[in-house]
Amino acid sequence: MKVEITQAEKVVTVTIEGRLDTVTSPELEKELAPFFAEQGVELIMDCTAMEYISSAGLRVVLTAHKTITAKGGSFTIRNINKEVRSVFDMTGFSRILKIE
């Protein structure tokens, strides 16, 4: 997995490439941790190049969503492929998260 983070003021875009699974999810969590302490962050997760997400990856996504929204921020997932979308749908995450 490759993670690229860009920030402009309070807008943080996280681009994920590859697989978000048990092996790679701790890396993403570490990359996101600095933004968990900030108030009013608008986090956008661009999943255009994400190939797969496991339950460990879903946990990181849900933790990020809960932490950021609890501090007055927003969390949006964009550009997921059909396979990743089906995982979000089957787990009910698509009802919890903002997916564009």
Regions inferred by a protein language model and the residue ranges of each:
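Amphipathic alpha-helical interaction surfaces in cytosolic regulatory modules
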Residues: T22-I96
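Short beta-strand/loop segment at the start of cytosolic alpha/beta domains
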Residues: M1-T15
